[in-house]
């Protein structure tokens, strides 16, 4: 599937009634934006579908009718090992991650990126990791103050900037990059399961934006939540429930 990054960007803007993500199309994004977009079945929209609708689309317009599959299971990958992340890519395809981006750390043709340990933080940037190469030469990276990665190996990344380099918008990101998979730019995640959206399937939800903020329960061992829905529209069989938590070993 080739989902439209432009649609997610426009969807994740403040609506005319003031609701939604508090940002405009040129603002930075948030780590939870893509999670909300996918888990609320507002996306993704196939690029080919969006291309035919783009001229008439506004952030207030609902295009969820063009979403064919809805995410039903998403796994956080923070604190995962390199081998576990590789397995996630093998099992479920690309994963969402973020790193600290500055043009200073790119090589000359913008196909390789390495930010050494101890480097100052720059702007966070979200990417899709689609593969890896354990033998990708460390010599391909730009030496920062004479420093290269200690070892070969890099993740293959699909960026969202179009065909801006000789790899058609892909680039290699060193395994040893300082901020990739760090707590600075969490969360990283993979979509582990989806369901086909048909006329017989409906997602009942109180809002469509996902987790627009987070909070902790420090002293409680259990938490109870209540959502109230109206099932009078003919959708009267509840076969699953989704909720979000960052607790380890949760399913």
Set out the residue ranges of the language-model regions.
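Predominantly the structural core of cysteine protease catalytic domains
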Residues: 7-154, 158, 162-238, 242-249
């Amino acid at each position: 599937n080739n989902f439209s990054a432009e649609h997610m960007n426009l969807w994740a803007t403040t609506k005319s009634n003031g609701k939604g993500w508090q940002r405009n199309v040129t603002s930075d994004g948030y780590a939870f934006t893509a999670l909300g977009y996918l888990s609320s079945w507002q996306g993704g929209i196939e690029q080919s579908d969006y291309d035919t609708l783009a001229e008439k689309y506004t952030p207030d317009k609902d295009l969820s009718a063009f979403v064919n599959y809805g995410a039903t299971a998403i796994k956080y990958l923070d604190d995962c090992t390199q081998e576990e992340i590789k397995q996630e890519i093998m099992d479920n395809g690309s994963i969402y991650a973020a790193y600290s981006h500055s043009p200073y750390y790119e090589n000359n043709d913008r196909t390789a990126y390495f930010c050494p340990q101890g480097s100052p933080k720059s702007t966070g940037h979200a990417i899709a990791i689609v593969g890896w190469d354990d033998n990708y030469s460390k010599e391909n990276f730009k030496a920062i103050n004479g420093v290269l990665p200690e070892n070969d190996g890099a993740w293959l990344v699909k960026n969202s900037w179009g065909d801006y380099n000789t790899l058609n918008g892909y680039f290699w990101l060193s395994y040893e990059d300082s901020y990739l998979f760090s707590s600075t730019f969490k969360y990283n995640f993979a979509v582990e399961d989806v369901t086909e959206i048909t006329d017989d399937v409906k997602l009942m939800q109180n809002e469509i934006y996902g987790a627009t903020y987070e909070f902790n329960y420090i002293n409680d061992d259990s938490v109870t939540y209540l959502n109230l829905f109206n099932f009078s529209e003919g959708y009267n069989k509840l076969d699953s429930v989704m909720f979000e938590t960052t607790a380890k070993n949760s399913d």
